[in-house]
A protein has these predicted regions:
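N-terminal loops that bind phosphate or other acidic moieties
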Residues: 2-133, 137-375
Length: 375
C-alpha cells in the first residue's frame, strides 16, 4: 500500500477549488488507509486557479485593489505578492466569468483592469510578475492593459482612442512617451497553455472570440484589427506561438513588454519543486472536473503525469466526469476514475457538498482497489 501519496488536483470548474478537491479525496483515502502520508499540491494550467495554487505554495500575501472590469465598471479585485514577485490572474479582473451572457461583446471589452492591477503591483515594489491570462473576456490585443500602463493610441485623424476591441481596429499610431518606467526593471512571465498565433485561422479572433460573444461579423472585424495592430507595432511577434492567448494579450506582453510565455502547469510544478517531491512518493493522484481528450493537451493533469512517469511514479486520475477516448486509454495513467455516480444529474453533481461527498466516496473505492493490488 502506498505510504506516501501526492494529491495534485486542478480545480473542478464551477464546483470546487483544487485544494477542496484534494481535501475531500484525502478524507476518503484516510478512511481506508489512516496512516498514509498525504501531500496536497494544488495545481493550475494558467487559467483561473493559478493565483490560488501559487499563493498557497509560496505563502503569498493577498492585496485588494480597485480596478475596472472588462466593461469599465469599478470592482474590487485581488492579487498576491511573494517577496518582490507579484502573482496576478487576469480572470479576476478581466475575466469572462465577470460578465453575463448578454454583456459579452469583444468589440466593447477591454483589458484595462489588468493593467491597473499590474500598476498597483509596481507601486508595491514588484520586480517580477507571474501573469495567468486564461479565462479572459477580451480580444483587444492587450490595448487596455497597455493604456493603463501609460501607452496612448491614436487613429488616422490623430484622435485618442480608448482601448477596446473596436478601437484596436482603428489604431494608426502608438505613443510610448508616458509608459510606466518601472516596467523596464520588471521581469514578466506569462502562464499560458495556448499556442495560437495572433491572427488568421489559428488566431485569437477566429478560435476564441466566439466564446466571448463575437458574431461571425465581429470575428472578421477583430481579426482584421489584430492585423492592423501588429502592422503598427511591427516585427514578427504575431507569428509566435502564444501571441493569440487571451485575445492577443500574449502578443502585447511579448512584443511590447518583453514578457516570456511559459506553460502554466510547468511553471506551477517548477515553482513548487514537484520533481523533488516525487523522489519518495509511491503514488500520485491528479484530475480535474472533466477528463477528456483535451486533458492531454497541455492541461494540469497531463503535466503531472509527464513529470511523475519520468520518475517511475504511478499516476491515477479522477475526474468529476470522464469522456473516454483512445487517447486516454493509452495515455499512461494507471487508472482513470469518475467521481460522479452513474445516473446523477450534472447540476446535482456540481453542487459543492455533493461534489465533495462524491470525491470522498471515490477516494475510498480507489484506496481499496489500490490496497488489493499492492498489499
Amino acid at each position: 500500500m502506498a505510504q506516501r501519496i501526492i494529491l495534485a488536483f486542478d480545480k473542478f470548474k464551477g464546483s470546487l477549488s483544487s485544494a477542496q478537491v484534494a481535501e475531500a479525496f484525502a478524507r476518503g483515502w484516510r478512511c481506508v488507509v489512516p496512516d498514509s502520508d498525504i501531500s496536497i499540491v494544488p495545481i493550475a494550467d494558467g487559467g483561473d486557479g493559478l493565483l490560488g495554487a501559487l499563493s498557497s505554495h509560496l505563502g503569498a500575501k493577498s492585496h485588494d485593489v480597485v480596478a475596472h472590469d472588462p466593461l469599465g465598471n469599478t470592482i474590487t479585485t485581488h492579487y498576491a505578492t511573494s517577496g518582490d514577485t507579484a502573482i496576478i490572474e487576469m480572470a479576476q479582473v478581466s475575466g469572462l466569468a465577470l460578465l453575463n451572457a448578454e454583456e459579452r461583446n469583444p468589440l466593447l471589452t477591454s483589458s484595462y483592469g489588468l493593467g491597473e492591477v499590474m500598476r498597483d503591483a509596481l507601486s508595491r515594489g514588484a520586480k517580477s510578475m507571474i501573469l495567468g491570462i486564461g479565462g479572459s473576456a477580451t480580444n483587444d490585443c492587450g490595448m487596455g492593459m497597455l493604456e493603463a500602463l501609460g501607452y496612448r493610441f491614436y487613429d488616422a485623424e490623430g484622435e485618442v482612442l480608448e482601448a477596446s476591441g473596436d478601437a484596436m481596429c482603428r489604431v494608426a499610431r502608438i505613443d510610448v512617451a508616458n509608459v510606466d518606467a518601472r516596467l523596464s526593471e520588471c521581469d514578466i512571465v506569462v502562464a499560458s497553455d495556448v499556442d495560437n498565433v495572433l491572427y488568421g485561422e489559428r488566431g485569437a479572433a477566429w478560435v476564441y472570440a466566439p466564446q466571448k460573444g463575437a458574431t461571425p461579423a465581429m470575428v472578421e472585424a477583430l481579426d482584421e484589427g489584430m492585423r492592423r495592430f501588429a502592422k503598427v507595432v511591427g516585427g514578427e511577434w504575431h507569428n509566435v506561438a502564444g501571441a493569440g492567448a487571451a485575445g492577443g494579450l500574449g502578443y502585447a506582453l511579448m512584443a511590447l513588454l518583453g514578457a516570456t510565455l511559459k506553460s502554466g502547469i510547468e511553471l506551477v510544478l517548477d515553482t513548487v519543486g514537484f520533481d523533488a517531491m516525487l523522489d519518495d512518493a509511491e503514488l500520485v493522484v491528479t484530475g480535474e472536473g472533466r477528463i477528456d481528450r483535451q486533458t492531454l493537451m497541455g492541461k494540469g493533469p497531463a503535466g503531472v503525469l509527464r513529470r511523475a512517469r519520468s520518475k517511475g511514479v504511478p499516476v491515477i486520475a479522477l475526474g468529476g466526469t470522464v469522456e473516454w477516448c483512445e487517447e486516454l486509454a493509452s495515455s499512461g495513467f494507471e487508472r482513470i476514475y469518475e467521481a460522479t455516480p452513474e445516473g446523477m444529474a450534472l447540476d446535482e453533481a456540481m453542487q459543492q457538498t455533493t461534489a465533495q461527498q462524491n470525491i470522498c466516496h471515490a477516494a475510498m473505492r480507489i484506496a481499496r482497489e489500490w490496497l488489493l493490488l499492492h498489499s
